[in-house]
């Protein structure tokens, strides 16, 4: 089974998709004139200062936290470990490249989600790639929108949303705390069921409280590991850069890797982690209270920066400096080994708390993504059966094999990204026009303030 899945994975994540994925990011980067570089300070400032005076279901901060809840997950811990184990330290460099260009992609897809969102008779907002494909490209492209929604449900059910997260939670609780898989599975299923029944506002409320806390906890812990291994950090960075462009030889428990394998592992796991181009984040971005589509695009873009440029970088570096990537361990066990090397007394507990929170919030976020895709395909009546099915799959997750889960996740991720990337390229002119209009609005607004002050002074 694993061999068949690996062959499918190699085909899906072959050169064509990698070129389309990174190529879309490069195209948008240049069409937007390096917006992810020059507008990043503005984007970071908007996280807390956005006015939230437009129509929407949740404020911009909660929308970002819900997206981060789904984004910052096991991909940041276990995913980075499996990428480095498969492709060597060079995989981290390709994660950086995917994230850099992915920031322009995330900005564009979330902008389009707000621009083409729809409002029903009850005032409920729906949006995401399926809507900007159908409403932006035209009705004749609806099959492409349906294709995205179908793969979105599969991704929530069998990819990022359930199996990968649940399996990581039960593995780390068993390793760190000795809790049997069955008990963890039951507890997780009950808690997920309780929160998901409440819908977006319930999920967003939990995310707004948990995500900032868990990100700060993980950041401080990993910085602590960097301090413990401070003398090895320069060499680790050199290893990452060298391994990105030259094959990595086999050593210890590491089997060796080609440059192509490092690139494929890094980009695939990078997309799994930050979800840029996947089309998931736009689904919740569409629900944000904002007047300007470009404003929510900027706020959403910071998610990729936080997720990969900060969190994944720290994870990758502590795995390299600690040397555990050369050992026989993989996945959560590999990261747990690095944590306990730095903090023998409490390292495993810190990782346990961080990983459980990361994975749990990812499950909640992806439940919502899948729900919106099901609603697009079959209407509101299909939501309850979808939720029941989701909860059942969460209960099944603990009993599947790690390797098969991650390969399966890669496959459905790639298939989900394909229709979204096609739409992003086709609608890139709309993104550029909306961006220019928003920046012109800000310029005019900033010019009005001194004029008003001068007028008040004269009177």
What are these regions (language model features)?
Residues 29, 107-117, 121, 223-239, ...:
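Extracellular/periplasmic helix-exit of transmembrane alpha-helices
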Residues 9-42, 85-123, 144, 306-312, ...:
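Extracellular loop-to-transmembrane helix junctions
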Residues 54-86, 112-136, 147-150, 154, ...:
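Alpha-helical membrane segments and immediately flanking helix-loop junctions
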Residues 20-27, 31-44, 166-173, 180-241, ...:
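Membrane-interface loop-to-helix entry segments
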Residues 34-60, 82-84, 88-92, 96, ...:
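Flexible loop linkers connecting adjacent transmembrane helices
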Residues 17, 31-36, 75-80, 89, ...:
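Transmembrane helix-loop junctions in multi-pass membrane proteins
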Residues 24, 28-29, 101-123, 130, ...:
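Helix-loop-helix module between adjacent transmembrane segments
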Residues 1-74, 84-91, 102, 395, ...:
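N-terminal alpha-helical transmembrane segments of multi-pass membrane transport
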